[in-house]
Design a protein with these regions (language model features):
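Active-site helix of classical SDR
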Residues: 110, 146, 154
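C-terminal substrate-recognition "lid" of short-chain dehydrogenase/reductases
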Residues: 166, 200-229, 233-234
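Conserved glycine-rich cofactor-binding loop
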Residues: 11-12
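Substrate-binding pocket helix/loop in short-chain dehydrogenase/reductase
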Residues: 86-87, 94-99, 181, 192
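Alpha-helical segment proximal to the catalytic Tyr-Lys
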Residues: 115, 159-163, 220
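Residue(s) in the substrate-gating loop at a strand-loop-helix junction
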Residues: 130
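Conserved glycine-rich Rossmann-like NAD(P)H-binding loop of the short-chain dehydrogenase/reductase
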Residues: 25-41
């Protein structure tokens, strides 16, 4: 039987690349989106699967998504939002929103996915953190906090679920060429490339390849780990 995966926030960018790569590795991948319906449905048609709209910060919507398309053998928590600026310019509602999506979304999706995985005594959870979750970033304090929280979440959950045969890992991307970089100038992007030992910005496919590895049997003894895919970025 074909194994099933859910990739949240997979209508574009890293999520879409990950969905394509997993599908190419034999997974049946459910596409999740909140705003980009046309892109999500086009990707679902390309992969011969379904696209399900759900706001990951809303536990009821997440559960409805799992009821409609699940259960899943692999959960990739990719959905997330960013906020740039001085912390003193950030409102509490903006703080709550980024925490609710980036951390709350991981909690909601994991809580919905775990019962089936525990019952089957197998499963895999991957969460997208960030290099900023490791080192922090100026004018990215809230984003860094949520991505750092994901790292602690993954390490704790891996210990909790290990006895049930479930692996939990995270990927910490560096600067990746997605829509999140659209607000940066060419000079800014060059500086990001220069900060990498490899002299370039990463591609979504770089992250997707890491996800395919961590989801595969080749990583059967890998859990509780944070895989940096950043070109040895210097912060």
């Amino acid at each position: 039987m074909q194994k099933k995966a859910l990739v949240t926030g997979s209508s574009r960018g890293i999520g879409a690349a990950t969905a394509r790569a997993l599908a190419g590795s034999g997974w049946r991948v459910t596409i999740n989106y909140i705003q980009s319906r046309e892109k999500a449905e086009a990707l679902a048609a390309e992969l011969g699967t379904e696209a399900v709209r759900a706001d990951v910060s809303d536990s009821a919507q997440v559960q409805a998504m799992f009821d409609a398309a699940g259960p899943f053998d692999l959960l990739v928590c990719n959905a997330g939002i960013a906020w740039s600026g001085l912390l003193t310019d950030m409102t509490y509602s903006e703080w709550r929103r980024i925490v609710d999506v980036n951390l709350g979304g991981v909690f909601n999706c994991c809580r919905a996915a775990i019962p089936h995985m525990v019952h089957e005594k197998r499963g895999c959870i991957l969460c997208m953190s960030s290099i900023l979750g490791v080192y922090g970033g100026s004018c990215e304090t809230a984003y860094s906090a949520t991505k750092g929280g994901i790292i602690a979440f993954v390490k704790g959950l891996a210990k909790e679920l290990g006895p049930s045969g479930i692996r939990v890992n995270a990927i910490a991307p560096g600067s990746i060429d997605t829509d999140m970089l659209s607000c940066f100038t060419a000079e800014d992007k060059q500086a990001m490339a220069d900060a990498s030992a490899l002299g370039r910005i990463g591609r979504p496919e770089d992250i997707a390849a890491a996800a395919v590895y961590l989801a595969s049997d080749a990583a059967s003894f890998v859990t509780g780990q944070i895989l940096g895919v950043d070109g040895n970025m210097v912060i």
